[in-house]
């Protein structure tokens, strides 16, 4: 029986890794061994940061809403408590955008909640 060297698959596998590491710096893009390790680590960071991004954006929205509310004499926790009681169904992302881009509408919402 003939010996199978598997050369085509071997080259294709290496090519696939090196193609994914195209924008990396130095030997991390051309040396297969380093490229493979760097790519694996990069994928780990990507997975971790997809989870972290959600937390970061939520924190950003809360900070923006809180900053807009301090000028109006109400704090964040009281605002959200009143928001839920008055049955206004706006999420933090929408409220954050309103606080930055359309301050008049945001003020109307705060006024509605205060009364």
Curated annotation (Swiss-Prot):
Alphabetic keyword roster: Ribonucleoprotein, Ribosomal protein, RNA-binding, rRNA-binding
One Pfam family it belongs to: Ribosomal_L20
Domain of life, source organism: Bacteria
GO biological process, any: ribosomal large subunit assembly
GO molecular function: rRNA binding; structural constituent of ribosome
Keyword RNA-binding: yes
CDD domains per the UniProt record, alphabetical: Ribosomal_L20 (cd07026)
Cellular component per GO, a single term: ribonucleoprotein complex
InterPro entries: Ribosomal_bL20, Ribosomal_protein_bL20_C
Family the UniProt entry places it in: Belongs to the bacterial ribosomal protein bL20 family.
Annotated NCBIfam families: rplT_bact
Function: Binds directly to 23S ribosomal RNA and is necessary for the in vitro assembly process of the 50S ribosomal subunit. It is not involved in the protein synthesizing functions of that subunit.
Full protein name: Large ribosomal subunit protein bL20
This protein's encoding gene: rplT
């Amino acid at each position: 029986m003939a010996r199978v060297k598997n050369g085509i698959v071997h080259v294709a596998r290496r090519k696939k890794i090196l193609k994914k590491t195209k924008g990396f710096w130095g030997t991390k893009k051309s040396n297969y061994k380093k490229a493979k390790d760097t790519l694996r680590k990069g994928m780990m960071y990507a997975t971790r940061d997809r989870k972290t991004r959600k937390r970061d954006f939520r924190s950003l929205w809360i900070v923006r809403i809180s900053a807009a509310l301090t000028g109006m004499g109400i704090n964040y926790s009281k605002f959200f408590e009143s928001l839920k009681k008055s049955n206004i169904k706006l999420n933090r992302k929408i409220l954050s955008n309103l606080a930055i881009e359309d301050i008049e509408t945001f003020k109307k919402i705060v006024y509605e909640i205060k009364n």
